[in-house]
C-alpha cells in the first residue's frame, strides 16, 4: 500500500490538464505508441469537438521511480469549467493529493483558485506545476509569485514542464511520488468502497468506478449497497489503463471499476458506499454534498411518441451525471416532457446535445430560469422553478431571488468595463483586492443575471482575460414579476419569464420584437403581446399574407372592389377564429437572445 499514489489533476479551463495526462500515460507506458491519441481521456465525441473535458476519467499506471521502487499511480483527469465543478469535488474525494496545473503564460485564474480551495478543504496535498513553459509568452517566475500571492501555496520550486513537448513531465511524476502521501486505511477491516462515478453499459448494466478506503474486494464476492441495502454479486472487476482491464481483486487504497449486474439505474448512486454482505461496515463513508441545480428548463420531445425513450435516456444520463435533476411536467403548448435542473448554461447545452446524439431524440427546450423562494400571504414558503408555477400575485407576500457570489480575476485595464457590466446586472460590490497587475473582484449578483449571459459578456468586455467563479449565497427579497406572452389572446405557458419589475417593460418589448422575427407569417394577423397580470406592456403584430384580390378588376366600379375586399376580410376573420399558430423551436429560445446584441 505504501507505493500507491492517488491524485487528481486540477486547473482552469485550457491550462493543459488533458495534455499532461496524455504525457503521464505515455511515460508510464499505459498505452502503446500506436494507441496513443491526443487527449486520450476525453472519450466522448462532444468533448473532442469542443476541446473541453466534461467527465472525470480515471487511469491506473505503474511507474518505476528513480529510487528503484515501482509505484502504482491512480489518477483522475478532471474538467475545468465552473459548470462541472461537482465532477471535480467528487474526484478529489477519492484522492490524497492534487496536481495544480497553472499555465505559465496566463497565470492564476478564478477556477484555479476555486478548485485549489476545494482540494485544501478536503485536506489534500497540493503540488503546483507550471505548464506550457515552451511558449514564448511564458513567465514562470512571475506566475510562481502569483501563485504564492493569490493562492497562498509556496511555489518557488514548483516543477516547470511543458506537457506538449514532454519537457519536465518526468520531474512532475517524481515530485508526485515524493510529496503526495500514500493512502491510509486498514486492509483487514470490513470493506468500505466509495462510488466515485457510474455509467450505464448496454451489455453489462451499471458499471461503477470505486475507490477502496478499507478492506479489499475480490471477484465473486457478495457486496451490499449501503443506502439501499441491496446485495449483489461481483461479476467483473478491474482497472483502467485507459483501456478496461480485468483483474481478480482490488485492495485497500486502489481505484478501479466493478460490474455487479445491477440493472436498475438507481441501484448504485454516486457517493454511496459499498460494503461486504457477510461482515458489513458499521457506517457509510461521508459521501458528497448534494449539489443544487441552479438553472431549470423544460425539455419536451417534439413528437409525443418519444416520451418513453426520452424518460429512459434521462435515467441513463442522470446515472452518469449525478448533478442532473428531472421531474415530469406537462405544458398546454408542448405536451408532456420533463423539468430538468442543471448547474449552468453550458451544462444544459451539453446535456441537450448528449440526449440528441447518444439517444437520437428531437427536443424542444424552453428558456432557462432559476429557482425563486416565494413566501405566501398565509406564511407558507414554496420554491418556484418554473414561471408557470408562480402563484397569483395577490397570494404572494414576497418573492426572493437567489443571489450568487461571483469572484472575478482580471487585469487592471479592464476593471472599468467589468464594473459597468456588474452594475448593469444589478450587482453589489463586496470586495476588491489588487495583486500586482491583477485585480480580484467580488460581487453579489442575482443568479438569474449570472446564468443568462454574464459569462459571455464578461469574456467579451475583458477580451477574454477575466475569469469567473460563482457560488450560491442566499435568497433575497426582490420586486419580481411574471411576464406572460399571449399569442392571438392565448397565453403560452412555455414562453413566460420571471424578471425584475424595473426591467419588465423593456424585457417584454424586446421579447415580442424577437418573437416577431421567428414566427412565420400566416394567412391572418398574429398579435404577440407581453403582459404582467392583465396589464399589456408590449405588442407587435406579424402581418398577414394576402392575395391581391383586385388584380383581376380592370378599372371598374368601386362597389365591385369593395365587395371583393369585404369578402376577403370575412374569410380572414373566419380563418383567424379557427387558425392555429405553429411556433418554431427558435421562438421558444427567443428569451435567451433578449439583451444579447447590444
Curated annotation (Swiss-Prot):
Q: Which NCBIfam families is this protein grouped with?
A: lepA, small_GTP
GO process terms (BP): positive regulation of translation
Sorted alphabetically, which keywords does the UniProt record give?
Cell inner membrane, Cell membrane, GTP-binding, Hydrolase, Membrane, Nucleotide-binding, Protein biosynthesis
Q: Where in the cell is it found?
A: Cell inner membrane
Name the domain of life: Bacteria
**GO MF entries:** GTP binding; GTPase activity; guanosine tetraphosphate binding; ribosome binding; translation elongation factor activity
Q: Name the Pfam families for this protein.
A: EFG_C (PF00679), GTP_EFTU (PF00009), GTP_EFTU_D2 (PF03144), LepA_C (PF06421)
Question: For this protein, what reaction is catalysed?
Answer: GTP + H2O = GDP + phosphate + H(+)
- The residue ranges crossing the membrane are none
Q: What class of enzyme is it?
A: hydrolase
Domain spans labelled tr-type G? 2-184
Which cellular components does GO assign to this protein? plasma membrane
- Please name the SUPFAM superfamilies in this protein's record: EF-G C-terminal domain-like, P-loop containing nucleoside triphosphate hydrolases
Q: Supply the HAMAP family for this chain.
A: LepA (MF_00071)
Which organism's genome codes for this protein? Proteus mirabilis (strain HI4320)
Question: Which PROSITE patterns does this UniProt record tie to the protein?
Answer: G_TR_1 (PS00301), G_TR_2 (PS51722)
Where, by residue number, does GTP bind?
Answer: 14-19, 131-134
What Enzyme Commission number(s) apply to this enzyme? 3.6.5.n1
In which family does this protein belong, per the annotation? Belongs to the TRAFAC class translation factor GTPase superfamily. Classic translation factor GTPase family. LepA subfamily.
Q: What does this protein do?
A: Required for accurate and efficient protein synthesis under certain stress conditions. May act as a fidelity factor of the translation reaction, by catalyzing a one-codon backward translocation of tRNAs on improperly translocated ribosomes. Back-translocation proceeds from a post-translocation (POST) complex to a pre-translocation (PRE) complex, thus giving elongation factor G a second chance to translocate the tRNAs correctly. Binds to ribosomes in a GTP-dependent manner.
Q: What is its main location?
A: membrane
Q: What is this protein called?
A: Elongation factor 4
How is this protein situated with respect to the membrane? Peripheral membrane protein
Amino acid at each position: 500500500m505504501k507505493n500507491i499514489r492517488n491524485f487528481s489533476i486540477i486547473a482552469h479551463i485550457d491550462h493543459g490538464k488533458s495534455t499532461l495526462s496524455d504525457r503521464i500515460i505515455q511515460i508510464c507506458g499505459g498505452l502503446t505508441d500506436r494507441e496513443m491519441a491526443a487527449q486520450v481521456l476525453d472519450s466522448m465525441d462532444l468533448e473532442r469537438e469542443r476541446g473541453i473535458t466534461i467527465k472525470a476519467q480515471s487511469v491506473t499506471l505503474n511507474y518505476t521511480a528513480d529510487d528503484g521502487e515501482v509505484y502504482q499511480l491512480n489518477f483522475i483527469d478532471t474538467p475545468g469549467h465552473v459548470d462541472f465543478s461537482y465532477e471535480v469535488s467528487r474526484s478529489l474525494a477519492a484522492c490524497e493529493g492534487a496536481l495544480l496545473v497553472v499555465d505559465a503564460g496566463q497565470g492564476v485564474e478564478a477556477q484555479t483558485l476555486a478548485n485549489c480551495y476545494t482540494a485544501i478543504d478536503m485536506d489534500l496535498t497540493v503540488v503546483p506545476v507550471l505548464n506550457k513553459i515552451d511558449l514564448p509568452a511564458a513567465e514562470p517566475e512571475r506566475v510562481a509569485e502569483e501563485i504564492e500571492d493569490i493562492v497562498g501555496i509556496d511555489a518557488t520550486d514548483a516543477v516547470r514542464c511543458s506537457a506538449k513537448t514532454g519537457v519536465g513531465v518526468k520531474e512532475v511524476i517524481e515530485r508526485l511520488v515524493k510529496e503526495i502521501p500514500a493512502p491510509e486505511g486498514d486492509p483487514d477491516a470490513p470493506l468500505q468502497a466509495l462510488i466515485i462515478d457510474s455509467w450505464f453499459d448496454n451489455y453489462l448494466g451499471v458499471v461503477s468506478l470505486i475507490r477502496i478506503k478499507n478492506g479489499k474486494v475480490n471477484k465473486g464476492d457478495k457486496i451490499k449497497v449501503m443506502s439501499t441495502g441491496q446485495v449483489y454479486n461481483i461479476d467483473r472487476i478491474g482497472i483502467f489503463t485507459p483501456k478496461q482491464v480485468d483483474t481478480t481483486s482490488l485492495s485497500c487504497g486502489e481505484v478501479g471499476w466493478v460490474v455487479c449486474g445491477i440493472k436498475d439505474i438507481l441501484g448504485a448512486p454516486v457517493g454511496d458506499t459499498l460494503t461486504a454482505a457477510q461482515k458489513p461496515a458499521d457506517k457509510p463513508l461521508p459521501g458528497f454534498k448534494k449539489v443544487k441545480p441552479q438553472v431549470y428548463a423544460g425539455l419536451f420531445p417534439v413528437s409525443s411518441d418519444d416520451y418513453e425513450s426520452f424518460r429512459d435516456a434521462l435515467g441513463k444520463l442522470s446515472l452518469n451525471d449525478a448533478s442532473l435533476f428531472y421531474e415530469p411536467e406537462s405544458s398546454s403548448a408542448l405536451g408532456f416532457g420533463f423539468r430538468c435542473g442543471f448547474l449552468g448554461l453550458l451544462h444544459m447545452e451539453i446535456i441537450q446535445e448528449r440526449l440528441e446524439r447518444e439517444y437520437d431524440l428531437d427536443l424542444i427546450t424552453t428558456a432557462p430560469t432559476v429557482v425563486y423562494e416565494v413566501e405566501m400571504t398565509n406564511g407558507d414558503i414554496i420554491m418556484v422553478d418554473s414561471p408557470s408555477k408562480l402563484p397569483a400575485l395577490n397570494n404572494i407576500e414576497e418573492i426572493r431571488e437567489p443571489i450568487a457570489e461571483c469572484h472575478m480575476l482580471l487585469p487592471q485595464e479592464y476593471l472599468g468595463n467589468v464594473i459597468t457590466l456588474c452594475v448593469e446586472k444589478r450587482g453589489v460590490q463586496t470586495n476588491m483586492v489588487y495583486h500586482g497587475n491583477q485585480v480580484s473582484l467580488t460581487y453579489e449578483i442575482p443568479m438569474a443575471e449570472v446564468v443568462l449571459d454574464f459569462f459571455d459578456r464578461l469574456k467579451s468586455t475583458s477580451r477574454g482575460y477575466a475569469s469567473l467563479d460563482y457560488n450560491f449565497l442566499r435568497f433575497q427579497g426582490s420586486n419580481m414579476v411574471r411576464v406572460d406572452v399571449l399569442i392571438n389572446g392565448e397565453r403560452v405557458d412555455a414562453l413566460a419569464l420571471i424578471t425584475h419589475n424595473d426591467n419588465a417593460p423593456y424585457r417584454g418589448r424586446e421579447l415580442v420584437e424577437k418573437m416577431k422575427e421567428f414566427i412565420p407569417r400566416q394567412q391572418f394577423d398574429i398579435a404577440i403581446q407581453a403582459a404582467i397580470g392583465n396589464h399589456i406592456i408590449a405588442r407587435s403584430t406579424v402581418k398577414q399574407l394576402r392575395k391581391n384580390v383586385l388584380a383581376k378588376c380592370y378599372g371598374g366600379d368601386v362597389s365591385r372592389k369593395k365587395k371583393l375586399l369585404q369578402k376577403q376580410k370575412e374569410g380572414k376573420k373566419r380563418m383567424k377564429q379557427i387558425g392555429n399558430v405553429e411556433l418554431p423551436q427558435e421562438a421558444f429560445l427567443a428569451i435567451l437572445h433578449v439583451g444579447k446584441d447590444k
